[in-house]
């Protein structure tokens, strides 16, 4: 049961509850009008009667997100996702609403938070420079997606009764149409390229539609360009790795699962590492057929690499990368 007491111009709703330690506590909630207090009193009594009442919690959002990352993120995320999500938390969530109590977040609070984000300066990191003056709508969408997932866990953990980030009205995002190179422009770029390594990478990008991380992570054991395979139009590359940069913290926290190799940094005391890892999704693992022209380019590139390897001997750092 709950009761209402008038205190000067406000009204207090008073009720008892049992905390997580099994101890009975008393809670006072202040409301501006008698109507609001009556509504809250009825809500509490109904929840207590139906067994859906959640005891008050003063847990801060920053503390909750720490638990969320530890209990949820470390099981679900890879190293790249771990870094990006923690970056959003550290740069755009904790500095703005980190000190707010989880149970104090309402849909109206969320709308105000989005407005604040739109006026917040973008943050540059050690590995990525901000490209907009203020937080972009695309980044806001990522932040809300992260918080929606986090608060979904808060509901499951019985910290809150419903997710305030459901049905959020996001700012309209305008996606810029990317310029697409036509065949003539691609041919011009290849003709003017004088760097043999870049020339091979460009051909892989244009002919196979590979992403940069996939090109840099391609290893020779996944390149099938024997004479018989080329003659039968059966030359192909198998994409099952990608090269990316990850923080030492992410690697140490998540372990080396799905990481094939961690490259030794050129400079000491760096906070990140270049790694060779499994792609983010299984759908990214695929076989890509090679046109004969590109297959012959790769053959010549392999010969050039072998000559350098033979010349340098033991000094050649061989990671089997194309």
Q: Predicted segment positions?
A:
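Short, charged, surface-exposed hinge/linker loops at domain edges
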Residues: 54-71
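Basic, Lys/Arg- and aromatic-enriched nucleic-acid-binding interface segment
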Residues: 123-126, 130-137, 141-143, 156, ...
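N-terminal core-binding DNA-recognition domain of tyrosine site-specific recombinases/integrases
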Residues: 3, 17, 33, 70-159, ...
């Amino acid at each position: 049961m709950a009761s209402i007491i008038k205190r000067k111009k406000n009204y207090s709703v008073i009720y008892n509850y049992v905390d997580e330690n099994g101890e009975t506590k008393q809670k006072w909630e202040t409301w501006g009008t008698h109507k609001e207090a009556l509504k809250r009193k009825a809500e509490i009594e109904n929840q207590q009667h139906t067994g859906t009442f959640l005891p008050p919690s003063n847990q801060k959002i920053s503390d909750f997100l720490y638990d969320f990352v530890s209990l949820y993120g470390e099981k679900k995320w890879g190293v790249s996702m771990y870094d990006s999500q923690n970056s959003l938390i550290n740069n755009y969530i904790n500095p703005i609403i980190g000190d707010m109590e989880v149970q104090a977040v309402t849909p109206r609070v969320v709308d105000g938070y989005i407005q604040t984000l739109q006026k917040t300066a973008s943050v540059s990191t050690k590995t990525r420079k901000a490209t907009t003056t203020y937080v972009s709508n695309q980044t806001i969408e990522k932040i809300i997606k992260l918080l929606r997932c986090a608060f979904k866990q808060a509901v499951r953990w019985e910290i809150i009764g419903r997710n305030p980030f459901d049905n959020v009205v996001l700012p309209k995002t305008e996606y810029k149409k990317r310029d697409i190179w036509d065949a003539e422009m691609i041919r011009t770029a290849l003709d003017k390229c004088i760097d043999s390594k870049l020339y091979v990478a460009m051909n892989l990008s244009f002919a196979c539609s590979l992403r940069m991380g996939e090109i840099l992570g391609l290893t020779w054991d996944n390149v099938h360009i024997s004479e018989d395979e080329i003659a039968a139009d059966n030359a192909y590359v198998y994409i099952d790795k990608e090269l990316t940069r990850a923080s030492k913290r992410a690697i140490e926290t998540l372990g080396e699962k799905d990481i094939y190799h961690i490259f030794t940094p050129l400079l000491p005391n760096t906070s990140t590492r270049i790694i060779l890892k499994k792609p983010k999704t299984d759908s990214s693992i695929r076989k890509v057929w090679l046109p004969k022209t590109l297959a012959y380019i790769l053959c010549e590139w392999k010969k050039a690499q072998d000559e350098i390897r033979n010349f340098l001997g033991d000094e050649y750092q061989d990671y089997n990368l194309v």
